[in-house]
Amino acid sequence: THGAGNFSIWPNKFMSYGKNQRMLGPQSGSMGFGLPAALAAKVHDPSRFVLCFAGDGDFQMNGNEMGTALQAGLNPVILIINNASYGTIRMHQEREYPTRVSGTAIVNPDYMAIAAAYGFHGERVTETGQFADAYQRACDSPTGAIVEIVTSTEAISPRTTITALRAAAGK
């Protein structure tokens, strides 16, 4: 599952889905859709592995649903892509109003503390080489997990960077 934001381009563009696999995402661009959708998927079929992709701003829209997951005994694996930004809005501002970027930087909570507070496994990934092992441990966790993937705002989407947007705008 995933919510809305530039982070969702990555799984939609680069993940392969098998015959019995599905990706649930919002058709209306709703931030915060991914975690509730992941929980609904687990309720529908508790035996299935459920993976939720969430941007940092996206997760903060409905992160309180971690309580629902705990209460209902659900165990999704949540990948939080943390670029400390509302990335889609930032991308549009850089492209359309390059000298007036405003209100897109965000301060995030300690996602590992949130994972611990709800009894979930938690890991923070800051280098690409750390991901595979962290992801495997998350998948193996019987309690569900949060894997926070710290990225640069510079890599605003798979198609462009902040630097490229500014260069195109002549700034």
Labelled PLM ranges:
Residues 10-15, 36, 63-65, 88-93, ...:
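Short acidic, glycine/serine/threonine-rich loops at helix termini
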Residues 46-47, 73, 119, 142:
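Glycine-centered short loops/turns at secondary-structure junctions
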Residues 113, 128-171:
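Glycine/aspartate-rich loop-and-adjacent alpha/beta segment that forms the canonical ThDP
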Residues 8-9, 30-32, 59-60, 84-88, ...:
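Short gly/pro/ser/thr-enriched loop/turn and capping motifs at secondary-structure boundaries
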Residues 1-42, 47:
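Active-site diphosphate/adenylate-binding microenvironment
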Residues 47-134:
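Conserved thiamine diphosphate
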